[in-house]
């Protein structure tokens, strides 16, 4: 059950939704790593 101040997704009620939650976590980590890499590249390019 979702709560009013909940920041994440609600608990999965089926195996497919459980796999979607795992996919969401993996995709979020990949986006974070790519964003960090792009920020590093921009920072090194601007500083030289």
Curated annotation (Swiss-Prot):
UniProt catalytic activity: 4 Fe(II)-[cytochrome c] + O2 + 8 H(+)(in) = 4 Fe(III)-[cytochrome c] + 2 H2O + 4 H(+)(out)
Location of the protein in the cell: Mitochondrion inner membrane
Stretches in topological domain Mitochondrial matrix: 46-48
GO cellular component: mitochondrial inner membrane; respiratory chain complex IV
Primary localization: mitochondrion
One Pfam match: COX2_TM
UniProt keyword terms in alphabetical order: Copper, Electron transport, Membrane, Mitochondrion, Mitochondrion inner membrane, Respiratory chain, Translocase, Transmembrane, Transmembrane helix, Transport
Cofactor(s) required, per the database record: Cu cation
Ranges in the topological domain labelled Mitochondrial intermembrane: 1-14
Gene Ontology molecular function terms on file: cytochrome-c oxidase activity
Record InterPro entries: Cyt_c_oxidase_su2_TM_dom, Cyt_c_oxidase_su2_TM_sf
Annotated EC: 7.1.1.9
Cofactor stoichiometry and binding remark: Binds a dinuclear copper A center per subunit.
GO terms of biological process kind: electron transport chain
Lipid bilayer topology: Multi-pass membrane protein
TM regions (residue ranges): 15-45
Family named by the database record: Belongs to the cytochrome c oxidase subunit 2 family.
Subunit structure: Component of the cytochrome c oxidase (complex IV, CIV), a multisubunit enzyme composed of 14 subunits. The complex is composed of a catalytic core of 3 subunits MT-CO1, MT-CO2 and MT-CO3, encoded in the mitochondrial DNA, and 11 supernumerary subunits COX4I, COX5A, COX5B, COX6A, COX6B, COX6C, COX7A, COX7B, COX7C, COX8 and NDUFA4, which are encoded in the nuclear genome.
Function: Component of the cytochrome c oxidase, the last enzyme in the mitochondrial electron transport chain which drives oxidative phosphorylation. The respiratory chain contains 3 multisubunit complexes succinate dehydrogenase (complex II, CII), ubiquinol-cytochrome c oxidoreductase (cytochrome b-c1 complex, complex III, CIII) and cytochrome c oxidase (complex IV, CIV), that cooperate to transfer electrons derived from NADH and succinate to molecular oxygen, creating an electrochemical gradient over the inner membrane that drives transmembrane transport and the ATP synthase.
Record protein name field: Cytochrome c oxidase subunit 2
Native organism: Polypterus sp.
């Amino acid at each position: 059950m979702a709560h009013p101040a909940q920041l994440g997704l609600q608990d999965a009620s089926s195996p497919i939704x459980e796999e979607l939650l795992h996919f969401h976590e993996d995709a979020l980590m990949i986006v974070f790593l790519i964003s960090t890499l792009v920020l590093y590249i921009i920072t090194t390019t601007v500083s030289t």
